[in-house]
Amino acid sequence: MSFRTVCTTLGASLELNFFRVCNPARPTTIQDWLQERINAVAASISDIRLLLRVKSLPKSSESRRVFITGGTGYIGSALIPILLERDHRVRVLVRPGSKAKLPAACEVVSGDALDANTYRQVIRPSDTFIHLVGVPHPSPAKGAQFRAVDMVSGREAISACAELGMRHFIYLSVAHPAPLRIMKDYIAVRAECEQMIQERHLNATIIRPWYVLGPGHRWPYLLLPFYKVCEWLPFTRAGALRLGLVTLEQLILALVQAVESPIQGTRVVGVPEIRSAALNLPREITRQTA
């Protein structure tokens, strides 16, 4: 049985549960409210653990000026404190009137991620641009939203950075190709944005996780035995590694590594590289300071 067949069968059986997790309803019972509070505490503990780990790592000798779109979401809110801890200067784009809570040490600028004309003039003097904008809680029913938000915001960011000659563009994409058709629109939009990056000749790092494990996103731990078997079998190994699970901590460290090691041309960071970022980050810093 091929990895495609296994994933298609498994995906069909888990699709309903997957999208119930990704699209939780507003809390309507005490149990729902308690679960939200538990998730919030778990997120705080996870953030503290990650911060302590980062504190133990050597710092880069060069501070970056980083501009972030989508910085108030699940990934961005975990990434920003880590970049600040590592002495990078962070400027975050937020919607006008947004009450998003961001660390006091970062600079907040207002603009619309769907229209680069509202923020192009405040990107500089940043040398690194991280694009994290995406429709929250993605599901197959949100194909139109992926094109209206993910595609448009990506196109605007890519265009603005190409015009400004941005030193390094970092794009959070998704692992592909993938056999599961349930997220084909989501994957297609990110593949198109990757193509735009290539066409505009940006110096870019494209990061391709599949599913990110973290607070409120832990049910796929149940799939780990399945993944281990598929990674062990020669005929399913490549697909299992490409579409493997990564933790929020691993993804944040991969983003930090990308920030601190700009590239000429295009670099694609897949699941295996994301998983090894915690090991590679100290080595890269040692190499830079040697």
State where each predicted segment sits.
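SDR active-site strand-loop-helix element
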Residues: 69, 93, 132-133, 169-175, ...
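N-terminal Rossmann NAD(P)H-binding glycine-rich loop of SDR-like oxidoreductase domains
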Residues: 58-86
